[in-house]
Amino acid sequence: MRRSNPITPARLGRSAEGLPFSEDFGAPYHPSAGALAQAEQVFLRGTDLPARWAGQARHVILETGFGLGHNFLATWAAWRRDPRRCERLVYLAIDKHPPAPADLADVHRDSPLADLAAQLIAAWPLATPDLHLLDFEGGRVQLMLALGDIHDVLPGLQAEAHSLYLDGFVPARNPAMWSADVFKRIARLAAPGAMAASGHADSAVRDGLVRQGFEVRATGADATVARYAPRFQPEPPRGWRWPHAAAREALVIGGGLAGCAVAQALALQGWRSTVIDRQAGPAQETSGNAGGLMHGIFNAPDSPHARWFRAAAMHTARNAAAGLAAGELAGTLAGFLRLDERLNTTQAEAQLSAVGLPRAWLAWLDVAGARAAAGLELPCGAWHYGAAGWLDPAGYSRWMLQSAGDSARWIGGTGVAALRGPRDGAADHHGGWQAIDRHGRVIASAPVLVLANALDAARLLPAHCPPPGLSAVRGQVTRIPAGTPGLRPPRLTVAGQGYALRLDNGDVLVGATTQDEPVGIDGAALRLADQQRNLQRAAGLGVLDATAAEFGTTLLPGRAGWRAVTADRLPLVGPPIDLAQLAQARGGRVRLDAHRHQPRCVDDRSGLYLCTGLGSRGITSAALAGRLLAAWVSGAPAPVDADLRNALDPARLSK
C-alpha cells in the first residue's frame, strides 16, 4: 500500500510585477496577461471547450497542477454560461503544494469571478494527502482535488479524462512534472480522442506527448495543443465494464445508512434508484440508534484503515454540513476525543510529525488539555479530531435519501424474498434484475442491483457468488436521561473503553457492547448485564459517578442490534466475486495483466454490486462508500485512489 507523504502548503509571494509568485519553484503562477486570460486562451480554447462537452452526460478534465484555481474557475464559469453544457462536469486536479486558505482568498479578492471564487474558498479542504471531493452546483460540478506529488498521485487515479490541462511551472523549474513517466500515466487516463493543452511549448512537453500517442496539432510561443490518438487502445479491465450505460437505473436493497448513501451518490451521477426495505421507513434496524460516532482513525504508518477513515470522515463532514447548518440533522461535529493511555505527549507528537497531518484535523492533548476540552476527569491524554463528533444515524439516512430528490423512490414495508437476474432469464424491459416478494411477485426491476442490506446480503447473493464473509456482532447502547443524579454530560464526544455523547435534549448515550452472536429475535431485547457494562465504562470516562453507575435492576432506555463486520474491518464496496470466473482464472493460463482482471460480477450478464460490512463505523463510512459504489456503477472517476479501492473491493476475498 502507498504511504502518504505530508503536504506542504505553497509558499506564496509576489513578483516585481505584482504577480503571484511561487517561492518553491522560483516562478510566477501565470503570465502578465492574466491567469483567467490564459485559462480561456490556452486551456479552454486549446481543448475546444465548451464545444466538445455539448450534450455529454459527463465531461472529465484532468489538470496536472491546480495552482491557485484560475483554470478551474474559468472552466466552471464557461460551463455556467453554456446552454448546451454537459450534465456533469468533473474537474480532477493534482497539486503538491496547495495554497493556504488565506493566500487563496487574497489572490481572488478582486476576481471577476468573485462569486465562484468565494464558493471555492469556503469549500477549501485541509491539506491532507487525500483525494478531496468538493461539490458545487448541487453536485453537477465536482472538483476532485488530489493533494500530493504527481508521481504519487497519478498511479492511483482511476478515471477516463476527456480533456487534459497540462499545467505546471516550466520544465526548467519543475522537471519532475514533465517526466516520461508522468506523460505515460497521463496517457493511461486519457479517453480516446482526448484533447490536451499546455501553456508551455518546450520540446519536453511536445516530445513527451508524441511518445505516448498524442498528435501535436499546434504549438506556439507559449502553448501546445494535442489530441490523443494511440495506435493501440488496450481493452478495459473486466471490473470496469459498467453495464447498461444508457439505462441509468438501479435497485438498492436495504434502506439503512449504506442504502440511503448509495441512493444519494447515484443521484449525483444522474442515476435513478429504487430503494427497497422490509421496514416501513429508512434506518429502522441497526442504523436506528439515537446517535453514533463520526470520526477518523490515526496511526503512524498511515495504514489503509487510517487513510480510508480519514477520507471518509472528511467527506461525511462535508456531506452533512448543510443538514447540520439548517437544523435538519441532529448531531454536532465540533470535535471528538479518543483517549490513548499508551502514549505520552512526546510519543504522540513524534507519531503525528511522522505523518504530517494538519493540527486542525488531528492534535494531541495531554491529560489536562483533554480534561478541559471534555469537561470530565479523564484518566489520560487524548487525540483531538477537529471535524468529528456524532450524528443521528436514522436522521442522517433519511436526509441522504431526501437529498436524492425525485431520483430516489422508496418502497418500504416490503421484504425481498429472492432475486431474479440476467442469468436466470429475467425478462423485464431492461433485461436486468428483479426483486421478488414472498408471493413470487415482482416488486421492482432495474439493470443494476446493489445489495446494501448488511448481513442479509448473503441470503440474496446468486449461487455463482460466494458468501461475503460477514460476521454478526451484537451491540447495545444505553441512554441516560438528562438530570440523572451523578451524570456529567461531556462537552465533546469522547471515547476510550466505551464512548459517551450528549444528545440534543441533554440525554447522554453510552456504549457500546460487542458480542459475536448470531442474529436472533431474543438478541434485540435489552440486557441488564450489557447496560451495567456500559454504565461502568461511562464511569471510567468520568461521565457518571461510580456509585451512580449502579442502577440495580432498573432498565434504562437503549437499543440493541447487529453490525455486519468484515474480518479486516473495512467495508465491502464493489462487485462480488464470480466463482465461475475465479475457477477459470485459477485453472487457466496466468495473464501478465491478471491483476487487472479480477473475477468480478461485472459483465454483460451481471450488474451486481455490494455495499455492506460497514460495521460499527457506518456513519463515518457510508457517504464515501456510496460515492465509491456509484463510481463503480456509472464509470465516474473513483473518489479514492486505487489502493483504497482495492482495500474495499470484494475481490480482495479471492486472494
From Swiss-Prot:
Catalytic activity line of the entry: 5-aminomethyl-2-thiouridine(34) in tRNA + S-adenosyl-L-methionine = 5-methylaminomethyl-2-thiouridine(34) in tRNA + S-adenosyl-L-homocysteine + H(+)
Stored Pfam families: DAO, Methyltransf_30
Top-level taxon of the source organism: Bacteria
Keywords assigned by UniProt, alphabetized: Cytoplasm, FAD, Flavoprotein, Methyltransferase, Multifunctional enzyme, Oxidoreductase, S-adenosyl-L-methionine, Transferase, tRNA processing
Chain spans, region FAD-dependent cmnm(5)s(2)U34 oxidoreductase: 253-655
Coiled-coil spans in chain: none
Names of the cofactor(s): FAD
GO molecular function ontology, one term from the record: tRNA (5-methylaminomethyl-2-thiouridylate)(34)-methyltransferase activity
Record-listed E.C. numbers: 2.1.1.61, 1.5.-.-
Main location: cytoplasm
GO CC entries: cytoplasm
Entry's localization field: Cytoplasm
SUPFAM superfamilies to which the protein is assigned, alphabetical: Nucleotide-binding domain
Stretches the record annotates as tRNA (mnm(5)s(2)U34)-methyltransferase: 1-242
Biological process according to GO: methylation; tRNA wobble base modification
HAMAP family xref list: MnmC
Family assignment from sequence similarity: In the N-terminal section; belongs to the methyltransferase superfamily. tRNA (mnm(5)s(2)U34)-methyltransferase family. In the C-terminal section; belongs to the DAO family.
Function statement: Catalyzes the last two steps in the biosynthesis of 5-methylaminomethyl-2-thiouridine (mnm(5)s(2)U) at the wobble position (U34) in tRNA. Catalyzes the FAD-dependent demodification of cmnm(5)s(2)U34 to nm(5)s(2)U34, followed by the transfer of a methyl group from S-adenosyl-L-methionine to nm(5)s(2)U34, to form mnm(5)s(2)U34.
Protein name: tRNA 5-methylaminomethyl-2-thiouridine biosynthesis bifunctional protein MnmC
UniProt source species: Leptothrix cholodnii (strain ATCC 51168 / LMG 8142 / SP-6)
Lineage: Bacteria, Pseudomonadati, Pseudomonadota, Betaproteobacteria, Burkholderiales
